[in-house]
Amino acid sequence: MAKEQILVKPKKKKNGVGQYILGFFLALYTLFCAAPVVLTVISAFTDDKELKTSGFTYFPQHWSMAGMNAVLRYGKQLGTSYGVTIFVTVVGTFVGLLVMSMFAYSLSRPQFRMRYGLSIYLLIPMLFNGGQLSSYVIFTGVYHLKDSMLLLILPICVTTMNVIILRTYIQNSIPEELMDAARIDGAGEYRTFFQITLPLMKPTLAAVGFMMATTYWNDWQNAYLYIESKSKQPLQLLLIKIQKSIETLLSNKNIPSAVIAAMGGSIPQWSATMATVIIVIGPVIIAYPFFQKYFVKGLTVGSVKG
């Protein structure tokens, strides 16, 4: 007689009251984070006169493209500046990750005799800073890099905190036995780093890379100090100049009527400001969901211990 099998359905795990409360507060927090972004998008397409009289609102009565058109009027220069910003972001992030990961790998090796001295050298800029004036004198007077795109990449290429995160990840998340096995097989330090360590660092490289890319994308101070050519202006510097030109027009009482007519009968101030914000944060918002899991995993695994 065959034995009868009794299938027991697994009980569904019920969510406790605490999980519902946590979900409610997380949803509320998400709403608070998304609300300013939504308001910015709406305000960019709201009539500027309504913004000045009624203030910012989620439900405007009059819509207008004047603010966005005022920014997009710099179409050719806007495209050039977008290209400069993308180039600086991609190249700077790639070079920075390569240099910092090699630096972090060296500091994580117990047999490396100079690691303590280099660790102190790494911490000095974090504790003592020479200031912007000394950096300006060195870059322009010693290295003669005035109006060079290298000055958009080098000053923020390597940071102490990112090196510490990468070093901690190597020490705590990559088994030492893998590197010992590679050395037994005859692999040198370069081969061990590029073929074993670097591929295993993908989560934290993605996290640090996203933070670096965001820093490069939002940087305008270095361009403001060092860049003079319009063909080398990044996006943020161009948008600042657009905003200043609008403020200059608003403060000038002798504006030709042809200029006002070309801008739709009035000079948009707040709607143009919101339009510049959209142009800046748009690519970052689009890119973040693709890096979110690496961002969280890389930071939690690489920086909790150590």
Please annotate each region the language model reported.
Residues A2-G306:
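A hydrophobic, multi-pass inner-membrane permease signature
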